[in-house]
From Swiss-Prot:
This is Bicyclo-germacrene synthase. Belongs to the terpene synthase family. It comes from Origanum vulgare (Wild marjoram). Residues 316-322, 392-429 are annotated as: Homodimerization. Homodimer. The gene is TPS4. Mg(2+) 1 binds at D311, E315.
Amino acid sequence: MEIYSPVVPAVKDVKRLDEIRKSAKFHPSIWGDFFLSYNSDNTQISEAEEEEVAKQKEAVRELLAQVPEGSTYKMELIDLIQRLGVNYHFEKEIHDSLNYIHENSQHNDDEVRTTALRFRLLRQQGYRVPCDVFRKFTDGEGNFATALTNDVEGLLELYEASHLATRGEEILDRAMEFSSSHLQALLNQHLVGSVSLSKRVDEALKMPIRKTLTRLGARKFISLYQEDESRNELLLNFAKLDFNMVQKMHQRELSDATRWWKKLEVAKRMPYARDRVVECFFWIVGVYFEPCYATARRILSKAINMASIVDDTYEYATLDELQILTDAIQRWDVNETLEDSPPHVQMCYKALIQAYAEIEDEVVENFGGEELYRVQYAIEHVKQSAVAFFEEAKWIYNNSIPTVEEYMKVAFVTCGYMMLSTTSLVGVGSDRVSKADFDWIVNEPLIVRASCVICRLMDDLVGDEYEEKPSSVLCYMKQYVVSKDEARARLEQQVKDAWKDMNEECIEPRPASMQILTRVLNLGRVIHLLYREGDSYTDPNRSKEWVKMVFVDPI
C-alpha cells in the first residue's frame, strides 16, 4: 500500500496548515452507493446454476483424467485451466500431473514453446527446474538463435517463462530481453499472425502471467480465448459459468463492505480521508478470490480500509495531534475516547479500535476463541505502523531527508505490506494456517521483504513529484548524488530483483505452504497493477474499468 497520499502533514505554520487542510481533497468515490443495490435477491445463485456448474466441473475433471500424463496436450490443458481461473477446483489433479511431469520429463524437446511451457508450469508449482534447459536454444556466446523469431507462440512462452527467474539466472534475463524486444517488434509491424494471438501478445507485454491478478487475468483471458478458433467449448463454458457465479458472491460481499463503510460516516467525520472501499475490496480480491476465503476477505478488507484512514490522518494532522494518536494506538485501550483531542483524531482512533473488535468477533465466530491470538499479531503491526508514520511526520516537520537505509527501514512498515501479509492469514481456516505460520511471517521473511520493496518503490516511482514528502527517489538522489533519472533506474532494478526474490521463495524447499506464499505473491501482483503506470488507488478513474470487469459486468 502505502496508499500514498500527496498531502503535506505536520507543518509548523498553523495558518498554512489550515490552507492545506482546506485544499487537501481527494477525488470522491466514483461508486457511491452503487454496490448497495446488490443484495441476496439479485445475486442469488439458483439451484439450476449450481447443478450445471457441478456437472461441467466433473466433465472437466474427466477430461483431465483422459489426457495422457506427461503429454504436451496435458500441459496445455493445465495452462488453460489456470489461465481461465478455474484451477482452484482441480488442485489435486493439477498437482499430481505436474509432479509426474517433474519426475519423468527428460527435457529433451526441440521446440522452445514446449520447453518454456513445461518450465513455467513447474516453476509456478514450486519445482526447482534448472534454467539450463534453455541453453540448447542459444549459440556459443549465450545468445538466443534468431530462428526463434519465426515462432511467435514459442517467443511468447519464452517471454512468460523468463518472469519466473531468480537471482543469478542470466540466461532467463537474456530470454526476457530477447523475447520481449522481438515480440514488440513483430506486434508493431503487424507480423504476429491472427488477431487473437496479437491480442495475447499485446496483453502479455503489458502484464505477464507471473504478475497478473488471477481474477482480472481470468476475465481478460476468457474474452481472448473465446476468439480462439481451436478453443475447447467445455472449458470455455465452465469458466464463464464459474466466473459469473463467483462474481455474484463478490457482489454480495462488496455490498456488505459498502454498508459497513457507510456506517463509519468517513465522508462526514473524516472528509480528508480517501473514500476507496470499492478499490480496497478489489485489492483484497486480488489477494484471494476463491469462495473458501470469504471470511479472510471480510477481515482483510476492514484492515486495509483502516490502514488507508490511518495513513490519511497521519498526512493531515499536526505533529502534536499525531503524538496523541500514536501514544493511544500503543496503549490500545478499547475504553479510551481521546475526548480532549480534535474530532479527526478521536474518530480515527475510534474507527480503528472498533474495526479490530469486529475482526476479533469474526475470528471467534468462525474459528473459536482459541484462535484470537491471530488478531494480536495483526494489532501489533498496526502499532508499528503508527510509530513509523509518526517518524515520517517528524522528517517533514524538521525538513529532513533521511538516508536511503533510514528511509527504507521506516517505509517498509508504512507501505502496509508487512501488516497486510500477516493479516491476510487471520481469516484463513485452521486447516491452512497455524501459529507457526504467524511466527514465521512476522519475522519478515524474504518474500515479505520483497513484497515491501515492490510496494514501496513502485509507489514512490509514481509519486516522487510530491517533494514535500521524502521518497526513496529523493533520498537516493541526495545520498548518492545522482540525477532523478539515475535514481529511478537503480530503484527500478531493485523492484526487478525483488520479483526474483519472490520467485526464489516460492521454489522448493519452501519456507511456508504455497497457499500462504501465494497471498504475499498476490499482494505484489496487486501493487504492480495499481502502480504500473500511475497511482490507480488514489485516482479511482484509473481502476474503474478493472472494477467493472471483475464486479459489475458478467460474461
